[in-house]
Amino acid sequence: MKIFELSIQCWNVSCIFTNINGFKYSKLDNPLFFDHVSRHSIFGLIETQHTSDDIDKLQVLGYKCFQACRKKLKYGRKHGGIAVYVHNSLLPGVSKIATTGSETVQIKLDRDIFSLDRDTVISFTYCSPANSSYVQRTQLDTYEDLEQKLSCLGQDVDIIFLGDFIARTGTRLDYISGEDNTDMPDVYDYHIYGLS
């Protein structure tokens, strides 16, 4: 019997790519960012704002990327997008669950491979704000969409939810008081070589 210790994380990265002086840079190319995310056997990046043209730029050595993206409109900027990374050593026990749309990526951990009581589904989700142009245009109720996808999983699986659920807390704290927030460094320092 194999015993696995999984480290699973998820972050809203508010755009995986940055355009600096006409050059496109990926946060995945930043050594600090990559060092942090690569400590986890499974990690999800939410609101990557990528399109199908960017999929090859999302690949990370040693990981399989499962992604969902929205179509780029003729005018306007990119929105949404999810990229889920699974370390190659775990791939025999992980499968992507086919879903429609670009708001959710679900993967299933096989109970036999991971020595679990039941199969476990990890749902990485981005819920667009209700007043966003995307929701206004598509009339998508992201919570209803998520509920529909979860109802298809059945009763014999455990489910883990990760993502950005656009929770509004009003005047209450939307974080745990006293929590150590040094887990994910803010990464905005891009070293650009050859530019002055």
Question: Which role fits each region the language model picked out?
Answer:
Residues 1-196:
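A shared catalytic/ligand-binding motif for oxyanion handling
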